[in-house]
Regions:
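Conserved phosphate-binding elements of NTP-dependent enzyme cores
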Residues: 1-167
Length: 167
């Protein structure tokens, strides 16, 4: 046999922004957004896949701009973050959260672990393959919306490996 491709996988972080998540890095988020956009409810409302991104308007919460938290400035002390008072950490606006795919809102799906997602997306081959590869590498405990900035070097490395393996 011949080597078709060689990939170097390091422990470098996979995202510099909390907007980068396990689901966005692996490409699973694009497919999940398409599933939501294909629902009858989304079609009736005229929502495309972009509506289910917490990175763009419309769709994301206007208060926290899709972050799920807001910065709180404290006098004489370092600032901190607090759960968004409008979306309560959901990252999306109220209208977007009214759309359900198989009984679940988009923010609920982002709260699923890789193990849950593997089961629930079993009928969707690309998603099942993505979450299967992550689970096989011992990452079944991570949630789909887990911020890339909060991953350890080893977790980031295994996510990169899983992403390459499921291509």
């Amino acid at each position: 046999g011949r080597v078709e491709r060689l990939v170097r996988i390091t422990q470098k972080p996979i995202g510099r922004s909390p907007r980068s998540t396990l689901a966005t890095y692996t490409g699973a988020m694009d497919r999940i957004r398409s599933l939501f956009a294909a629902t009858d409810d989304a079609q009736e409302r005229g929502y495309g896949a972009g509506r289910f991104s917490f990175n763009t308007t419309p769709g994301r919460c206007p208060t926290c701009e899709g972050q799920g938290s807001v910065s709180v400035e404290l006098l004489f002390m370092p600032g901190t973050y607090s759960t968004c008072p409008e979306c309560h950490g959901a990252r999306y606006d109220a209208e977007t959260l009214q759309v359900h795919w198989e009984g679940h809102r988009i923010d609920e799906v982002l709260g699923w672990t890789v193990a849950e997602a593997r089961e629930r997306f079993a009928e969707h081959p690309q998603l099942a393959r993505t979450f299967g590869a992550l689970a096989d590498l011992g990452l079944d405990y991570l949630t789909l919306g887990h911020p890339a900035t909060d991953l350890s070097g080893g977790e980031a490395q295994r996510i990169k490996l899983a992403t390459e393996l499921q291509r």
